[in-house]
């Protein structure tokens, strides 16, 4: 069975007798899978909140190192301001621009499920936590002048305008993608953390990594429930998303050189992506599934 909306985009139905303008104003109605997963979302949200270790962006930004830019009478960024190794700043910029594109991922989750009740609470929480990462990364990097803020802003605008769309994914594909996507970013951050000497930045990247691990757990547990509800479709969904998952930053057109630098530094590359996918499939207990064995074997 395929869990997509009948008339609406992804997760809800709309009365066919309504005009187009009126239909767009109607409150969406959750479909079967959205309702099936709602108790699991509630359970996972409670666990997520009960186990949180709250942290704040301002605690990880050395504001005493900051100074005004030329617009306010100071001086603009210069390459000599950078003190971190290139592979570290490249990885940080990849991570930051990825986080800047959060709106697209939020939209796809809302369109595939529903921004109501416990689903709405989870999507709001996940979005807030992901946005925190963008806030703190940009604050740290701009205050410490480790990146060219003007060039970074140009890439941010370009990438956000390019956007992210997954409207061809089924609901289960969306969950499978999110679980593997979060795992990839967690591994990216852990490997980056291991190569940072500056203690504040090291702790910051570790915080982000922990959030990514917790997000992976949430989405992965929803997929685990889908395996009990519609196993065949879920296995197929995992296979489709595993086959197309890309390296972290691979979709940032302006940063392909940085993606190569990060790969050469051993932070994240195609080999590590394959390990991410294999480990996630194994964690779901699916390593012996015929359609997934291609992702397990080296």
Protein language model regions, located:
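Non-heme di-metal
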Residues: 19-298
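Short, positively charged and aromatic/hydrophobic N-terminal segments
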Residues: 2, 13, 20-22
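Residue-identity detector for glycine
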Residues: 5-10
